[in-house]
């Protein structure tokens, strides 16, 4: 089998595609993959590092307001579609899978024009612009959230989850909190605002530090590499022995597997990882995303009893501390939330999406 994967712009579009490839290789080791991404996107570094063949296209996103730049965007898109057609004809895939981002729009649309089966995957509860555009011509559509079902043609959309969940759930963790000077016997709260960090979360942590120092649970704060020194400079109370402040964590899935509770943004990949592992969570959605989709992602977990949510305007040291205490000092609440998170998580998401791809090829 030969498959073209395309998704770009953010890790939330890229990692599900790579996780899917990992699952498919377990079922069909001889599968050939080609990843088509954008020239300037992070996928141009992430994908080649995995050893997967990679082709580049030049695309850019639309401006939300009227702009002459949108004329250039359309021109680049049409050129990218033409280039994508050549790539597709040369590779001759059985199916083309798009996981979102503007580059996948050009690639999947080109495949549709060439009458090649296409599958798109929507990771968020609010469908992205690209996937909405592609949905009419797609052979099959997989979504991660029930809330996304109504946004696509009902005869070809199915809930499959996020392949990243299956990848994380299968990891055997060798991590020990002792590696950073903490105990494996105490509950541990991980506060993580994403790979670049989240200033509002960092500020709330600074505000809560004096009280965190007094708790009998452990607190690990990941600031983001560029924000680490700033956080240390702004502390008025130094961390106690139960608190660690780190710029980043390289082996995040292994650390997550040993985490008692987490404070996190509500991006699709984070949600997939949290639910796959059944981690009680305090979600702080970013309000600076398209369609406010992180709030809707978070609300789906809150409605299921799998998470707490603090909106960014309501975030403070006190609010963060109260939420953390409610999870880490109340075993029954934590246990219930763990069970509900696992119920929400789809731990065989990669297998489900693979089955959908086979259905698309068979049509």
From Swiss-Prot:
It holds the Pfam family Glyco_tran_28_C. Keywords: Cell cycle, Cell division, Cell membrane, Cell shape, Cell wall biogenesis/degradation, Glycosyltransferase, Membrane, Peptidoglycan synthesis, Transferase. It is an enzyme of class 2 (transferase). Its main location: membrane. InterPro entries: GlcNAc_MurG (IPR006009), Glyco_trans_28_C (IPR007235), GlycoTrans_28_N (IPR004276). It is found in: Cell membrane. Pathway: Cell wall biogenesis; peptidoglycan biosynthesis. Its EC number is 2.4.1.227. It catalyses: Mur2Ac(oyl-L-Ala-gamma-D-Glu-L-Lys-D-Ala-D-Ala)-di-trans,octa-cis-undecaprenyl diphosphate + UDP-N-acetyl-alpha-D-glucosamine = beta-D-GlcNAc-(1->4)-Mur2Ac(oyl-L-Ala-gamma-D-Glu-L-Lys-D-Ala-D-Ala)-di-trans,octa-cis-undecaprenyl diphosphate + UDP + H(+). Cell wall formation. Catalyzes the transfer of a GlcNAc subunit on undecaprenyl-pyrophosphoryl-MurNAc-pentapeptide (lipid intermediate I) to form undecaprenyl-pyrophosphoryl-MurNAc-(pentapeptide)GlcNAc (lipid intermediate II). Belongs to the glycosyltransferase 28 family. MurG subfamily. This is UDP-N-acetylglucosamine--N-acetylmuramyl-(pentapeptide) pyrophosphoryl-undecaprenol N-acetylglucosamine transferase. It comes from Leuconostoc mesenteroides subsp. mesenteroides (strain ATCC 8293 / DSM 20343 / BCRC 11652 / CCM 1803 / JCM 6124 / NCDO 523 / NBRC 100496 / NCIMB 8023 / NCTC 12954 / NRRL B-1118 / 37Y).
């Amino acid at each position: 089998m030969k498959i073209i994967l395309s998704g770009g712009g953010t890790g939330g579009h890229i990692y599900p595609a790579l996780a899917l490839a990992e699952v498919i290789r377990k079922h069909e080791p001889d599968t050939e993959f080609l990843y088509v991404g954008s020239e300037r996107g992070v996928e141009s570094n992430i994908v080649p590092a995995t050893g997967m063949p990679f082709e580049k296209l030049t695309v850019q996103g639309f401006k939300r307001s009227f702009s002459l730049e949108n004329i250039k965007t359309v021109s680049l898109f049409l050129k990218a579609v033409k280039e994508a057609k050549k790539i597709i004809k040369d590779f001759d895939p059985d199916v083309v899978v798009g996981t979102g981002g503007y580059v996948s729009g050009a690639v999947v649309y080109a495949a549709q024009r060439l009458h090649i089966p296409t599958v798109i995957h929507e990771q968020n509860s609010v469908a992205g612009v690209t996937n909405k555009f592609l949905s009419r011509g797609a052979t099959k559509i997989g979504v991660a959230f029930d809330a996304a079902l109504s946004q696509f043609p009902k005869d070809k959309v199915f809930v499959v989850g996020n392949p990243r969940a299956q990848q994380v759930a299968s990891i055997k963790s060798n991590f020990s909190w002792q590696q950073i000077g903490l105990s494996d016997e105490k509950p541990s709260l991980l506060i993580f605002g994403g790979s670049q960090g989240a200033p509002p979360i960092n500020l709330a942590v600074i505000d809560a530090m004096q009280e965190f120092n007094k708790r009998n649970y452990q607190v690990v704060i990941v600031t983001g590499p560029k924000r680490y020194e700033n956080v240390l400079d702004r502390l008025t109370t130094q961390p106690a022995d139960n608190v660690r402040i780190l710029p980043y964590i390289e082996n995040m899935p292994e650390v997550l597997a040993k985490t008692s509770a987490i404070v996190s943004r509500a991006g699709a990949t984070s949600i997939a990882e949290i639910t796959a592992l059944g981690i009680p969570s305090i979600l702080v959605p970013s309000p600076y995303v398209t369609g406010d989709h992180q709030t809707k992602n978070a609300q789906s977990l809150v409605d299921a009893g799998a998470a707490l949510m603090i909106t960014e305007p309501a975030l403070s040291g006190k609010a963060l501390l109260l939420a953390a205490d409610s999870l880490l000092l109340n075993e029954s609440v934590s246990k219930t939330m763990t069970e509900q998170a696992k119920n929400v998580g789809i731990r065989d998401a990669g297998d489900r999406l693979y089955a959908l791809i086979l259905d698309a090829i068979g049509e």
